Amino acid sequence: MTTRCVMVLGTTSGAGKSWLTAALCRWYARQGLKVAPFKAQNMSNNARVVGGGEIGSAQYFQALAARAVPDVRMNPLLLKPERDTHSQVVLMGQVSAELTAMPWRGRSERVWPQIAQALDALRAENDVVVIEGAGSPAEINLMASDIVNLRVARHADARCLLVTDIDRGGAFAHLYGTWALMPESDRALLRGFVLNKFRGDASLLAPAPQQLQALTGIATVATLPMWREHGLPEEDGVFDDRSHASGAVTRTVAVVAYPRISNLDEFQPLKNVPGVRLAWARTPAELAGADWIVLPGSKHTSGDLAWLRAQGLDRAIAAHAARGGAVLGVCGGLQMLGEALVDPHGIDGNAPGLGLLPLVTVFEREKTVRHRAAVFGQLGGAWASLSNVPVAGYEIHHGQTAIHPQMAQDGHAVMPEGLAWQNARGNVLGLYLHGLFEDAAALHALFGAAAPTLDATFDGLADFIDNHFEAGVLQGLIA
């Protein structure tokens, strides 16, 4: 068959593009087709390690949904925000210092040939490419430099769905306004409107879908009910701030939500572990009652550490640890738990650590990006159940961490090559490996239970859209 490209555009960020793209990937894969996802440019601090470097987490999961091997071509340009006005640029999996220093308008034309080449290569190798847009295609101030929405749609001759979040209100205005602001020649690419996150009786929407079709010539092809527990992380850049619990709560895990939090998607499985309540904390009050406090990854470790101190969270974490409460630091969180952050190259900034682990971290120019599998050594205290447990995960960091030479008695390595450290008391654990809570063996060791498998999650997504799209629409998009 001729390769078809199906594209998911959205009226806003957070409309549901990422999970709908994953659902489409699995739906088409279940038809026996060879499928790949694609997103030209992603802005996210949620990244995964693949062959050749790193890509946005959303495209990583979409590839798994498509039963494909994740590939840097699926997300050729990744922007990782470090400050409000500055992002690290990752091109084809590798950090580019040149592009990072370049104004974004000039950057767009520079990278477009590689984006087009990556997309063309995926089209040549697959039956279907499911493309995700970014934000809205009707941002008229950005159209001249667009490399992720309509320019991609035109290049791929994609059949596009436009999805909107009806729960926000104003969905029909969003759909009509987006259509109206699109260049007339591009409107022909739209094959259907999708209403996402609907609550209530869908018949009450009439006659709005029919009126919208009369105005635009485009039918509403799906009304998707609100479904919070679909099992995938929220769209990149959208922070799911609710706490989650599966069943009666026996343990509360509070993750500190600093401004430049990264790889927060690795905590997604905790939402579905029986007895575990996952909460996000920005204030000392939100840490109260936590059994475990987790300091996650950070794209700006010293800056997030300063923010943490300004909120008084440092004192709350120290008090929790002093009471014997369990504390876990992952990557940037591990670095914060140490004695000092040393930055000789101006990468992240110098800062004193929280002093809960006897470690010193030096930020190096070279970035470590790799898959890792390792085995915990003998642990004590709150983390004893992880003793001798194998864990598979990934590393993404500039820091290199070692024991403070004068404090060796206060802690020790509990994984080869300095991948994990524990304090002498046994209640504070630092880990460079991302993915602890995604590892089945680790989940079982920590909780005696496991979250649903990703494969079951993807099949659930495919079943959901199969039930709620108008008959024949999904097949018609690739006919």
From Swiss-Prot:
Keyword Magnesium: no
PROSITE patterns, sorted: GATASE_COBBQ
Domain GATase cobBQ-type, residue spans: 250-442
NCBIfam families attached to this UniProt entry: cobQ (TIGR00313), PRK00784.1 (NF001989)
Entries under PANTHER family matching the protein: COBYRIC ACID SYNTHASE, DETHIOBIOTIN SYNTHETASE
Function in brief: Catalyzes amidations at positions B, D, E, and G on adenosylcobyrinic A,C-diamide. NH(2) groups are provided by glutamine, and one molecule of ATP is hydrogenolyzed for each amidation.
Name under which the protein is recorded: Cobyric acid synthase
Organism name: Variovorax paradoxus (strain S110)
